[in-house]
Swiss-Prot record:
MF annotations from Gene Ontology: chromatin binding; DNA binding; DNA-binding transcription activator activity, RNA polymerase II-specific; DNA-binding transcription factor activity; DNA-binding transcription factor activity, RNA polymerase II-specific; DNA-binding transcription factor binding; RNA polymerase II cis-regulatory region sequence-specific DNA binding; RNA polymerase II-specific DNA-binding transcription factor binding
Lineage: Eukaryota, Metazoa, Chordata, Craniata, Vertebrata
Keyword DNA-binding: yes
Name this polypeptide is given: Recombining binding protein suppressor of hairless
Organism in which the protein naturally occurs: Homo sapiens
Pfam families according to UniProt: BTD, LAG1-DNAbind, TIG_SUH
Length: 500
């Protein structure tokens, strides 16, 4: 198998954390309330984002069909800059404090590729592929990160990627739902002139404008609209799979900017088919007609996004002739996001696996209020915190944890019951002080008075867990609790104009 020159083996050598400037680092410390308060005030998180397509086309023989759009790793949050400054204050050189990353397809047969993060917060992996000798039907990208001084950051995995042989030529049916594209999901759009890889450009938003970028790609929500939906910044969306001939709205998942209403049309050679109505499938070529215009299509011209006027086909009224720049390949995209913060300073162990909380479920009420967390990568050394209060926590499995909801008096001194709504962030904390932020909050809502005391919650935990109770428990027999909530978003957008 051909290997990229100079690439390391699939697993770069494991790096043991280097000792501090004046000897070994102190043993790990449990997080204190003061440290949590500082974190909640500053929010100096370090976030690793892995953006990638949901499907990858297999390479046969000696060919290399590079993943398109290329997987991209972003380092987000103010914590990266703060970490670098802290390392340099502690005696590291600029090179030693620089994050390094390698990416691979989780297969020991293929070498990992180094990502160049120097001087910027993102990098794309442009030469990844999966060969037909790899028999997996699904795989995950693996991103190994460490600092220039060899301190380990950890291994971060993408979401699951489906391997396909080639885009479906036959009329797609909803039986292959995993190849169809649902309303409200994210897609990338790219244009490739004369099938040349070097000419590939991606729809992207930068500086408040849509443009065709050769370096970065955007992930856009594709929303299905009613055919009679009028143009506007707010719009009503429909559920279901996207079919050709339907009205859609493309909204940038980062900026919220949107294109005007579009009708998605199937492309055959250099024509847009006006009567196609089958489901849109992965890696199909499609065109976007700007609704209520005179045959105007979304098109690129170098880096600019423009309107292109199609020509009617004289002998075929169901077709319109378009140019190459108006033909877009569509593919579903996904994102893996991992956020962490060293609450008690540098740690010896990698920060991974990073736990991800997907949902919260409140069980019971009053003194027996228990919160169930569902997600991924849970471990027994994690505790749930409500604001700056550590909760008694029970580990169930890698996807489930349970905790006792702290009494309201832990947040409002002297309160015996909830007098006004109090919202607190929910976070997970590892036993060495690593804080894992979630986007979830817990809300205490007002009640007319105290509830009767019941010690069932403590009994449930003690019966099911061998975990040591938290250092600072706040328990009280009265109080009331309500819901756990996520930050939901309504569909509003700012519509961009397309140059004619």
């Amino acid at each position: 198998m051909d290997h990229t020159e100079g690439s390391p083996a699939e697993e770069p050598p494991a790096h043991a954390p280097s000792p501090g400037k004046f000897g070994e680092r102190p043993p790990p410390k449990r997080l204190t309330r003061e440290a949590m308060r500082n974190y909640l005030k500053e929010r100096g998180d370090q976030t690793v984002l892995i953006l990638h397509a949901k499907v990858a086309q297999k390479s046969y023989g000696n060919e290399k069909r590079f993943f398109c759009p290329p997987p991209c790793v972003y380092l987000m949050g103010s914590g990266w800059k703060k970490k670098k400054e802290q390392m340099e204050r502690d005696g590291c050189s600029e090179q030693e404090s620089q994050p390094c990353a390698f990416i691979g397809i989780g297969n020991s047969d293929q070498e990992m590729q180094q990502l160049n993060l120097e001087g910027k917060n993102y990098c794309t992996a442009k030469t990844l592929y999966i060969s037909d000798s790899d028999k997996r039907k699904h795989f995950m990208l693996s991103v190994k990160m460490f600092y220039g001084n060899s301190d380990d950051i950890g291994v971060f995995l993408s979401k699951r990627i489906k391997v396909i042989s080639k885009p479906s030529k036959k009329k797609q049916s909803l039986k292959n739902a995993d190849l169809c594209i649902a309303s409200g999901t994210k897609v990338a759009l790219f244009n490739r002139l004369r099938s040349q890889t070097v000419s590939t450009r991606y729809l992207h938003v930068e500086g408040g404008n849509f443009h065709a970028s050769s370096q970065q790609w955007g992930a856009f929500f594709i929303h299905l609209l009613d055919d009679d939906e009028s143009e506007g910044e707010e719009f009503t969306v429909r559920d279901g799979y996207i079919h050709y001939g339907q009205t859609v709205k493309l909204v940038c998942s980062v900026t919220g900017m949107a294109l005007p209403r579009l009708i998605i049309r199937k492309v055959d050679k250099q024509t847009a088919l006006l009567d196609a109505d089958d489901p849109v499938s992965q890696l199909h070529k499609c065109a976007f007609y700007l609704k209520d215009t005179e045959r105007m299509y979304l098109c690129l011209s170098q880096e600019r996004i423009i309107q292109f006027q199609a020509t009617p086909c004289p002998k075929e009224p169901n077709k319109e002739m378009i140019n190459d720049g108006a033909s877009w390949t569509i593919i579903s995209t996904d994102k893996a996001e991992y956020t962490f913060y060293e609450g008690m300073g540098p740690v010896l162990a990698p920060v991974t696996p990073v736990p991800v909380v997907e949902s919260l479920q409140l069980n019971g009420g009053g003194d027996v209020a228990m919160l169930e967390l569902t997600g991924q990568n849970f471990t027994p050394n994690l505790r749930v915190w409500f604001g700056d209060v550590e909760a008694e926590t029970m580990y169930r499995c890698g996807e489930s944890m349970l905790c006792v909801v702290p009494d309201i008096s832990a947040f409002r001194e002297g309160w015996r019951w909830v007098r006004q709504p109090v919202q607190v962030p929910v976070t997970l904390v590892r036993n060495d002080g690593i804080i894992y932020s979630t986007s979830l909050t817990f809300t205490y809502t007002p009640e007319p008075g105290p509830r009767p005391h019941c010690s069932a919650a403590g009994a449930i935990l003690r019966a099911n867990s061998s975990q040591v109770p938290p250092n600072e428990s706040n328990t009280n027999s009265e109080g009331s609790y309500t819901n756990a909530s996520t930050n939901s978003t309504s569909v509003t957008s700012s519509t961009a104009t397309v140059v004619s």
